[in-house]
Amino acid sequence: MLNYVIKRLLGLIPTLFIVSVLVFLFVHMLPGDPARLIAGPEADAQVIELVRQQLGLDQPLYHQFWHYISNAVQGDFGLSMVSRRPVADEIASRFMPTLWLTITSMVWAVIFGMAAGIIAAVWRNRWPDRLSMTIAVSGISFPAFALGMLLIQVFSVELGWLPTVGADSWQHYILPSLTLGAAVAAVMARFTRASFVDVLSEDYMRTARAKGVSETWVVLKHGLRNAMIPVVTMMGLQFGFLLGGSIVVEKVFNWPGLGRLLVDSVEMRDYPVIQAEILLFSLEFILINLVVDVLYAAINPAIRYK
């Protein structure tokens, strides 16, 4: 297992390098001139050219790439073109709000999604199954930005129960986490149901029932453990989805996180911040998949990696 983990970690190097190249090319193909945006609409050509020189945008593209990649290897992503602060500081100040929002959304989505999926599987083709799957399909179909605006209108504007902006208290997390986790809970419910339906028809489940084990214990002890492997896969993928999906939700709720920072950076063509954030998201996806693979072996000892 240790050798497998080490090999996967070493595989990060070429993957992140390829991502770095693609991101660098992508941001430099974006329409618009960051120097003009930073200088302002009233700036003349001389001022814009001076800003370009200060930002290093007057240098050849290959020189800019070498400067970017050589510094990135050392953990230095440069300065933000807009704030002139170190990119690492910009990301660090926004990281925790996004992380806590993602964790909060994931926790409630997994709990409610798995519960709904188990109930739907146990009472298959009956009203609990139909009700759970109807709600799940609705959760998948409803766009996050529309759900967010609806929740703001009802619970903040009309009822005045919850705040709409900020991340200072636990109340600020309720509406964004509900918005962000709704689609994940729906996917988890459908995936858990499909996995449990297969497990409930296995021979060892019938054997446990024949021995007189209660249905609740059969479902929780024998069914849950064996149905968890595909569900854990989906949990890992959905956690990555939450990190990426937070971009829309953070914009709707004016959340002070990485998603809003990325949107603002794209609007201002802040190349260093865009490159560093996408690299961070890529690293998170890779590490999440590695954690999921390790959890496989913990859930099912028959699985071994070489």
Curated annotation (Swiss-Prot):
Residues 30-102, 156-168, 250-277 are periplasmic. GO terms for cellular component: ATP-binding cassette (ABC) transporter complex, substrate-binding subunit-containing; membrane; plasma membrane. Disulfide bonds: none annotated. Coiled coil: none annotated. SUPFAM superfamilies: MetI-like (SSF161098). It is found in: Cell inner membrane. GO terms for biological process: glutathione transmembrane transport. The chain crosses the membrane at residues 9-29, 103-123, 135-155, 169-189, 229-249, 278-298. GO terms for molecular function: glutathione transmembrane transporter activity. It is a multi-pass membrane protein. Residues 95-292 form the ABC transmembrane type-1 domain. It comes from the Bacteria. The complex is composed of two ATP-binding proteins (GsiA), two transmembrane proteins (GsiC and GsiD) and a solute-binding protein (GsiB). In the presence of glutathione, interacts with the glutathione-binding protein GsiB. NCBIfam families: PRK15081.1. Belongs to the binding-protein-dependent transport system permease family. Part of the ABC transporter complex GsiABCD involved in glutathione import. Probably responsible for the translocation of the substrate across the membrane. This is Glutathione transport system permease protein GsiC. It comes from Escherichia coli (strain K12). The gene is gsiC.
